[in-house]
Amino acid sequence: MEAARFLIRNMPHWYAYEGWQLDSVRQMLALRKLDKESIKKWKQVSFYSLPKVYDAQVITSNYLIENIDLAFKVWKKYPWNRSLDFDDFCEFILPYRIDNEPLSSWRKLYYEHYTPILDSLYHGEDVVYACRMVCGELKKRELYYFTELIIPHMDGEFLYHHRIGYCRESCDITLYAMRACGIPVATEFFRYSPEYQHYHTWNTLRDTTGRFILFEPGKIDPTRDKITTDNRKKGKAYRYCFGEQKSTALLLNRKGYRNT
């Protein structure tokens, strides 16, 4: 199966971090025990120096099969994907992970929650409108904004139950929900803004024309009527991709980044 080949071919450079330190921080975030002393303590930990667990060493065939089957199900089910070719399906619906989060069975969880809602609200063929419907459901639960610790991504199951973090986590939750519903989306980012010297991420929707439309649940609705923007001055922007991008891989740690 070509979908399995795509995932396996690009699997070697994907990994998660592990350690009791991350387990403890996740528990603290889940309980929102965010007192100054705890934060000060964990700021001294270099989370990105913890051991890496590579997907190729731990992933199971059952995990891949479930992910592929559910991804194919929504790709074929929804009419807006008639114009979504296999290559774009592989990048914007199929991937089982986002970045360096622990592996989890997120797709079934989000599928079972969000697809019944989408199916009850919309029966059309417009992917932009479908995206709006899921955005409407996502914005019902606000993200608890927290930026004090620099840690690897949290897994999809954790974020489903505990919405805490900053723009990165907001994008992750949105991506999980949209892909579980067969809506092709990506996360884009810049490393540095000339305006406020910081990192930022946002989501984009792949329209049926191949155009990518910026959106943010609760703040910026996806639309074709105008070029949407969050009004931030951006430096060079990149798009996260699961497949290794030869032109930018060496620049950004050999992971799947693409200039946009």
Language-model region placement:
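Surface beta-strand/loop "capping" patches
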Residues: 254-260
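Hydrophobic/aromatic-rich core segments of domains that either
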Residues: 116, 121-137, 147-157, 163, ...
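Secondary-structure boundary elements
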Residues: 1-162, 198
